[in-house]
Amino acid sequence: MTVTEPATQRGFPLLPSRLSRGSKATRTTDNTAAALLLTFTVVAILWANSPWAHTYSALLDTHVGFSFGSHHAEMTVKHVVNDALMTFFFFIVGLEVTREFTIGELTDRSRAAVPVVAAAAGLILPAVVFLAFNPSGENAHAWGVVISTDTAFLVGALAIIKPKFPARVRLFLLTLAVVDDVGALIAIAVLYSDNIQVAPLVVAVALLGALALVRYLPKARGPAYAVLGAALWIALYLAGIHPTLAGVAVALLIPVFTPERAPVERAVQQIRAFRQSPNSRYARAASRSLRDSISINERLQTAVSPVVSFVILPLFALVNAGVLLDGPSLTAALRSPLTWGIVAGLVVGKFVGIAGATWLIRRTGLGVLAPGLTLRRIAGGAALSGIGFTISLFIVDIAIDDPSRQDQARIGVLAASVLAFALGWAIFRITDWLSPPEPVGLKLLRPIDPERDHVRGRPDAPLTLVEYGDFECPFCSRVTGAIDEVRAHFGDDLLYVWRHFPLERAHPRAFDAARASEAAALQGRFWEMTHELFTHQDDLEWSDMYRYAVAAGCDIEQFDQDVRVHSSKVLHRVSDDAEDADAMDLNATPTLFVNGKRHRGPWDAASLIRALEAGRG
């Protein structure tokens, strides 16, 4: 049987996917983007309310365009940003949605069930609340303003509030944000497009067919996507459908896949050839091999996302957030059911919808929360989900024609965002005060569960020893010998637990080895596979691990299926342990917990025996 290496799916930490579990550098980038968005929002508000407000209006109404023969095209600066540049924002959203449903967090349907249902409730209930304030008339058409959460501000708000152990709630909210974006995009496509022109629409459909075939081109796929995408934008614009949806359509048709061993090995060979004989031909070949080993979806996210985060979204905030906040405008907003409908929809509707749906699906047993994620954490995150900005202001511009009512709606969006932040901050602070978490890392965060954890010994043993380690760590290998002595000393009085904490920066094969051990565990061969991995921890290529699986007594066909085809079974099991370690601020392996408390000191058998004996009393 020919075996290919299953690609590591843990996050791609340097990529901009919002579900990435990546590094602190990635989170810093997210926070910087949110800060920049906030800065441009404040600048727009100050500018629109300054003595130079006329220059702000003049800038937005400035026409830009070009001529080609007898044809002339022009748009205002505001429409260039909202209709043209924002296409790239929706393009990135589409790429992320495609990736998450294909190879990301949403491939595990049971894991995604709770945030997906919560997101659906967070889309529907805010609209219902808004329509209770605006049941008819022109205002009712603006119900879409309250359905979306601004992901950039959501991430920034979590960074500012700094709730205890935020990793789980952050992942939950980012998963929810993906579904939230899908709902908003559908609303824009179906309900905020009118006066459809048939001929351009037919052209748009034909272009979509051509885009679907681009993946089969032997080369020049990038330029083909760009040219056909631009043509699709024009066709949708002429058809009367909001042209930014061209970005989503193109993104959904771009293939995404996990890196496979064969193209990666070809890239390594090309790099080795270039290292031995540097020349332009080898340089081009190496560059092309590296590029082809990663899906175009991933490459485009890496290339386009920084431009969207640091240029397009700040420009969008600048041209859309400049609402007049003088006395008459605020008075009109305070008396407007449009404003109050938006505030209530975003603040109350989002909170009740997300928190209520989470409670209900958990209570009925239709879904489960990830380890370490509590309902009170969900409540704080649900409140922050009322921060609506980017898509909310976007829909304000296309759903409302009257400038004065647009200002009332924008005031509602801004007020709701401030209130949602304050409510989220209060919930996190109050729950932390009423039920203060344990000091980070001093006590075991997640209790031992013999049904879930990998354990050796009696489940009701009076003494427990939990190890967070990785299979490439030489110290973990040495501790394994010491723990064998400790187990022999205590016999049935000791329950030993292994949990995964692969330190990928120091040990690049540790995560893959952990996945292999979990695939073996599905066949009841975890400890046998653990022995093989520690015995050969200097040789942890995937081809080696298949040999170790055979030596451990695994059915190799089933092992291959579990690590390649059904990889989410093992991926999330490893990630759960690693995220618990991250939540406890662990930073080294092995990390040991003796009777639930962090062990500080030597790892030799005698020291561990003394620590366990001290815990008997």
Swiss-Prot record:
InterPro entries documented for this protein: Na/H_antiporter_dom_sf, NhaA, Thioredoxin-like_fold, Thioredoxin-like_sf, Thioredoxin_domain
GO CC, alphabetical: plasma membrane
Lineage top rank: taxon: Bacteria
Cell compartments where the protein resides: Cell membrane
Protein's GO biological process: regulation of pH
Record has Protease as a keyword: no
Record Pfam families: Na_H_antiport_1 (PF06965), Thioredoxin_4 (PF13462)
Region (Na(+)/H(+) antiporter NhaA): 1-433
GO MF entries: oxidoreductase activity; sodium:proton antiporter activity
Disulfide bonds: none
UniProt entry keywords in alphabetical sequence: Antiport, Cell membrane, Ion transport, Membrane, Sodium, Sodium transport, Transmembrane, Transmembrane helix, Transport
Region named Disordered: 1-26
Stored NCBIfam families: NhaA
HAMAP family: NhaA (MF_01844)
Protein name per UniProt: Na(+)/H(+) antiporter NhaA 1
Organism: Mycolicibacterium gilvum (strain PYR-GCK) (Mycobacterium gilvum (strain PYR-GCK))
Lineage, broadest ranks: Bacteria, Bacillati, Actinomycetota, Actinomycetes, Mycobacteriales
